[in-house]
Structures are given as C-alpha cells and as structure tokens.
Amino acid sequence: MKRFIAMLLMLCSALLMTAAFAEEAAPEAKITVVEQRFINMEDDGRGFFFAKVQNTGDAAGYVDYKGNIVASDAEGNIILTENYVSTAPDEVYLEPGEYAYVCENIYDDALDTAEVADCKFSIRAADDGEEYEKLASEAKIHYEPDEEDDNYVDVTFTNTTDEILYDYEIVAALYDQNGELLFINTEVVSGIGVHPGSTITVRLYIYEDILMYFCREGLTPTTVDALVYCEK
C-alpha cells in the first residue's frame, strides 16, 4: 500500500511538472523598445517622444495602449510621466519580428524649467486590439534646412484592396546617416476615397521647431521608413 501511494505521488508530481513546463514554454508576444528619442523644446513647455517598438516574442500579439514614459533630469529627479502612450495606429497587431512606431506630443509646465536627461519608455503586449492591413509604399524626403516651409516627406501608395479606402493612416519615420531615429510624423486621412488600383501621394511635413532642433543639434535626416495602414 505504501509503495502504491509513493508511486501515485511520483506520478502526480511528474504531471504537475509537465503542466508547469508546458505553461512556461507557451509562445507569447513580447513588445521591445528598440529605438527612442525625446526632444525637449527650449522654454516652451513642450516635448516630442518618438520610438520604434518590435514584437521580439515567439507569438503574434497586439501592442497595449497603456505605454508609460518616465522622464528625469540629470540628477535623476522625475520631471514628468505620461501614461496611455500607444502606437500609431493604436493597439496595432504585430507578428513576431514586426514593428510599429510611437509618436507622442507632450505638453507639461515642467519642461519650461527642467531639461530631460533620461527617458524610459515601457509598453506591453495585449490580448486584444485592432487589426490593420499594411499597404506597400514608397517615401522620399525633401529636406532644405534653409527653407522653413519646404521640408517634408512624400509617401506614395496604391490601393491593392478590392474596396474604396476612405480611412487610412500614414506613418513616416526619419533617420540620420547612422541609422538613428530622429523624427516621426503621422497623417490620418478620412473621407478621401482611394479607388482599387489607384495611387495616391500624401505629404507629411517636418515641423518648423523640429527643423530648428535639427539645425541646432547638427542632425540631418537622410532616410525614411514609411508605413501605411488601412482598416480591415
């Protein structure tokens, strides 16, 4: 009887270990911040936050809409926090290896007197979200720093779906010659239909204060990565 009980306990233990291992090994999405930039506009109470996030997990998933920014000064004092920071578009679905961009305008009086020296951004995967279809596109930069109103990115794409597209979002990320993320702009277009097979070009401008920041810091955008999303 004792031997039977001992064998039963060993069997139960083995089953529990197998279940625990299976649960631990279950594939899941993991959202990783691979690049980011915080721009503190001087004496303006404004800032810009840009990031590239990637699904580095082994399963597809959505990006949570509750990302968190924590910005600190040179002494490590927290200047500001921002919650509910999401991708563009919101709660996007990513397969393993796929990426999306984050573009957040920040308004906070603390930026009038304090300068951001360090910025930490965290965002998780979620079980629910939105699914979009991505359309192939081409993008070109027009950059003339001496001309304040003549700096932009043209993004061209073709409607390869079977329906007229009335709602779509364009995201353009600018990089320098070293592959450093400099700036992201987005454009949500609604109510202008693109017929199946038709091609359209959307212009996204580089803000004047971003241009001044580039000139002040000696930065030059040389390449652009554009993503075009439409609702499924």
Regions found by a protein language model. Give the residues of each.
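Sec-dependent signal peptide cleavage junction
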Residues: 15-29
